[in-house]
């Protein structure tokens, strides 16, 4: 894996300096976590994005991620995962690898992709560090779909107008990160892995954003209740969601989220969240709380965060999380630093 990354970096850097219609972007995010008792964790994410023009309307896209942490388990035994970058150590995994074709107002991508590239990426939602603001738990909890840090073979279509946009995707029902072996990221096997299809209709006007979506998924539920992740059961489920980012005043937005899952008795059945974000000079703060109903429990998760830009290409983001479950609660603080290396 390390040799592959070095070769990829070398090729991309050379392309950036000598090729036309090519671009490399390197971003690094690191995060210090503490439970204010005895526990600490250091989480890291390295991402490389590479694009190469294959023609007037055709582009080759590739992105890799590498994750590392110093602690083998999370500081909190939470259902929603308070940090949206924390994962097990993965030296190298694909986020995207494929070709995108532009057709007027439309675009079509075919290849390896994870759904975090396209969905739940609007500005207000993206401020928060809770994983549920990156993808609603009704869609992701306990199902190994093409969700960070894994990806799968898929098609992604977009239709863009000034205010309206439509997104539609079809993925292999299970995501992977390995490059070889039976369970590799290039695998497409709907018979055993199932299929995940997603559609989202989006509208924006005067600084406000509105989204409504629907997903169909047939796949395998990871049965952790018996302590044996290998034991799975095939299920079909339907998920609907919607969220609004309403501009209340210049630099002030309200956030409202909701989602419901049917067709299965497992995972997250319903989810609702609300929040407020504000700008203070060049900095941005936010307050968010959500409720997720799992089978057979529930979880409240609240977050206070403040994003402080620096040096034009980076930011520092201190955040405080409070998590409440039946019979347990957690207080977690984190300090996130992120920087995008300027390209030449």
Each PLM stretch: what is its role?
Residues 22-24, 56-60, 105-108, 163-168, ...:
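Repeated loop/turn-to-beta-strand initiation elements of outer-membrane beta-barrel proteins
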Residues 24-32, 62-66, 108-114, 168-172, ...:
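Transmembrane beta-barrel strands of outer-membrane/channel proteins
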Residues 34, 40-46, 90-95, 149-153, ...:
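Residues that define the transmembrane beta-barrel architecture of outer-membrane proteins
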Residues 46-52, 97-101, 155-159, 199-203, ...:
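Residues on the lipid-exposed face of transmembrane beta-strands in outer-membrane beta-barrel proteins
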Residues 51-173, 284-288, 294:
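Outer membrane beta-barrel
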Residues 158, 164-222:
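Loop-centered beta-sheet repeat module
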Residues 169, 203-294:
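Detector for outer-membrane/organellar transmembrane beta-barrel domains
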Residues 329-344:
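Outer-membrane beta-barrel "beta-signal"
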């Amino acid at each position: 894996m390390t040799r592959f990354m070095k070769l990829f970096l070398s090729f991309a850097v050379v392309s950036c300096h000598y090729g036309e219609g090519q671009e490399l972007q390197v971003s690094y995010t690191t995060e210090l976590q503490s439970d204010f008792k005895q526990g600490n964790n250091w989480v890291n994410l390295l991402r490389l994005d590479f694009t190469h023009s294959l023609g007037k309307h055709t582009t080759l896209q590739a992105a890799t991620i590498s994750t590392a942490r110093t602690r083998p388990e999370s500081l909190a035994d939470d259902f929603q995962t308070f940090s949206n970058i924390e994962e097990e150590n993965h030296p190298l995994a694909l986020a995207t690898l494929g070709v995108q074709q532009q057709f007027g107002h439309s675009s079509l991508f075919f290849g390896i992709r994870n759904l975090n590239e396209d969905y739940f990426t609007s500005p207000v939602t993206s401020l928060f560090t809770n994983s549920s603001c990156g993808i609603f738990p009704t869609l992701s909890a306990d199902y190994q779909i093409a969700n960070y840090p894994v990806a799968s073979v898929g098609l992604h279509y977009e239709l863009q107008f000034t205010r309206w946009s439509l997104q539609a995707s079809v993925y292999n029902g299970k995501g992977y990160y390995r490059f070889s072996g039976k369970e590799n990221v290039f695998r497409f096997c709907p018979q055993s892995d199932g299929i995940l299809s997603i559609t989202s209709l989006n509208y924006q006007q005067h600084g406000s954003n509105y989204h409504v979506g629907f997903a169909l998924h047939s796949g395998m539920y990871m049965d952790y209740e018996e302590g044996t992740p290998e034991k799975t059961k095939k299920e079909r489920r339907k998920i609907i969601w919607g969220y609004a980012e309403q501009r209340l005043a210049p630099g002030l937005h309200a956030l409202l989220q909701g989602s419901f899952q049917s067709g299965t008795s497992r995972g997250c059945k319903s989810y609702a969240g609300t929040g407020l974000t504000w700008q203070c000079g060049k900095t941005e703060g936010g307050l968010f709380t959500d409720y997720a109903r799992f089978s057979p429990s529930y979880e409240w998760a609240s977050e206070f965060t403040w994003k402080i830009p620096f040096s034009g290409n980076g930011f520092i983001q201190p955040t405080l999380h409070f998590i409440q479950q039946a019979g347990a609660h957690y207080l977690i603080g984190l300090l996130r630093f992120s920087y995008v290396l300027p390209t030449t």
